[in-house]
């Protein structure tokens, strides 16, 4: 089982100074976020299946199951931080003086 690292620089689109905003970037970022959530869901499912298999049938290695659980936990914490940042940004937008 290989562990894949999450690299934020590869997820975010590259932007250069003076470049005008394109509408495609907004949908692209949304698709990237959706893909990240799908990946997180798959990781959670794999971890739950591994735990279930280890406890019921004894299949699998305890250290591999622990690694999968920690990976799933890390992805959940990352999603929670992103959620908190989005909510905080939204609150700041609401409080802006027009």
Curated annotation (Swiss-Prot):
A GO CC annotation given for this chain: bacterial-type flagellum basal body
Entry annotated with the keyword Translocase: no
Record has DNA repair as a keyword: no
Disulfide pairings: none
Annotated spans, Disordered: 22-56
Pfam family, one: FliE
Cell compartments where the protein resides: Bacterial flagellum basal body
Ranges of compositional bias, category Polar residues: 23-56
Record GO terms (molecular function): cytoskeletal motor activity; structural molecule activity
One of the GO BP terms on file: bacterial-type flagellum-dependent cell motility
Key words, A-Z: Bacterial flagellum
Top-rank taxon: Bacteria
Alphabetized HAMAP family for the sequence: FliE
Membership in a protein family: Belongs to the FliE family.
Name used for this protein in its record: Flagellar hook-basal body complex protein FliE
Organism lineage string: Bacteria, Bacillati, Bacillota, Bacilli, Bacillales
